């Protein structure tokens, strides 16, 4: 039997909730992975926002008479694969840069997920879910914008690991 529009929006919300809780766990790992107070502060801010996302999604599910699924969603599977691919950090400098890249990618994945939720919920006339999705999409866009310049900054910190060693890069 095919899903009703409400069942589908509930499934999308459950997937979004699973993604937000998975993102929270990933960001907690990024915080634990670094000793850099500036990165810890940025990731802590992202984590607070992500936890608030999960709470708002859960509240919307409850308003629809449903509960979070507790399962792992599509986004969690993608982030697990991204982590596997980028697990080769050789030192603290690489680890910081890679974790910033992963957090940036995560923000964009969530942004796309919320755009899909917005489009679908708008099409079925669920204005409350659409408004929530649009808000969350904007918050993830802002998070990505905060993270992007840090990629450049922290990629360059790897120079500190080779500074003074007499090794010069020549192209």
Language-model features: where?
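Amphipathic alpha-helical hairpins
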Residues: 1-171
